[in-house]
Amino acid sequence: MGDGMRDITITSDGCTVLARRCSSRETVQVGLVEKPEGVLVVCRTEGDTTLDVYDAPWHVGCACVTAQNLPALIEVLAGPLPSVERTLPALLTALFADDEVQFSDLLDILDAAKVPYAYRAFGPNATAIRLEGDEALMGALFE
């Protein structure tokens, strides 16, 4: 992992690392930034799988959910995890404790439950953005 990207991911504006998985082929790190306006879930990958999928050595995906949509997010995550404390950090930690769960699975869960979110992904070769809902508020959370 490049030192600059590690610093951004781990220490960026109150980001709490919830899960870190390392294998011989891939490192996955999931973090959460909580602000009064909403939350930002960040997933950084690095390794052979990332190189195969994105043609880049590392990739970062971010999902932003506004404060008004947090109850729906917690509800949809708590459904399959009834024994987990109903807080976002606990639910996300439990979700990503499963080595088979990828960041795209979280996005699929949000889409299926119709929980609005903004998405941003970036790496050394490209940036992708998808905004839904209050674009100004979503933009503020991404700053």
Region spans (language model):
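Intrinsically disordered, low-complexity regulatory segments enriched in Ser/Thr/Pro
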Residues: 37-75
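Short, Lys/Arg-enriched N-terminal segments with co-localized hydrophobic residues
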Residues: 1-4
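Amphipathic, interaction-prone secondary-structure segments
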Residues: 11-40
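Intrinsically disordered, low-complexity coil segments
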Residues: 21-28, 61, 79-82
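N-terminal low-complexity, Pro/Thr/Ser-rich intrinsically disordered segments
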Residues: 7-8
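Low-complexity intrinsically disordered segments
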Residues: 64-143
